[in-house]
């Protein structure tokens, strides 16, 4: 796990022996389950350390020291897949509450298994779509941090994510490649859903060679009750425009 250890140090993170052991076990279980569940195309030991584990931990750069120390810090990972970035963030922030949301039951089975194997507490695995789950009182506007590595465009992600975020919280979207046009197109959705663009942070880590960004959006007022719209609508008719 040396690549992960070195990269994490550049983020200001010094992983403990326990955390390193958890990441090793995570890797072993990921590769083992991937043979039948098709969780990821990345299985090389070095690449998992950087492209999955380290990449997930970069979300920490979007958080303040005060936020990291909050005893009631809560995270929801939308479309988490094999648990990225949610589980690596939970390993780093063991005191946090984490919800892992994915629409696929097979992935949820793996997630529940890995949560138990890593002995992570205060973690809930939820099977469902963001469009529906965000309207449930238990989840709506109830999280400090909303994260997603999903490949959907930013206007779509904003509609799905911001309703989960409480006032004063953040949505952090992890993006690769050109993001400028996406951000322009998402400006209306950000405003409509109660957000405000905080910053777009380019990641400068040699371990992550391709262009990666954190798009950080603050939640400043409540999302209108009608959002997100019913399943599939945000994808078919995203809120696109400039405010």
Where is each model-derived feature located?
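Class I SAM-dependent transferase core
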Residues: 1-76, 106-109, 113-123
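Short loop/edge segments at beta-strand edges and connector loops
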Residues: 17, 127-129, 201
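Conserved SAM/SAH cofactor-binding pocket of Class I
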Residues: 57-152, 158
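Helix-to-beta-strand junctions that scaffold the AdoMet/dcAdoMet cofactor pocket
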Residues: 93, 165-167
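Short alpha-helix immediately C-terminal to the canonical SAM-binding loop
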Residues: 107-109, 179, 183
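Short "lid" loop at the C-terminus of a central beta-strand within the Rossmann-like core
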Residues: 131, 176-180, 205
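Conserved beta-strand signature within the Rossmann-like core of class I S-adenosyl-L-methionine
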Residues: 168-178
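SAM/dcSAM-binding transferase cores
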Residues: 184-243
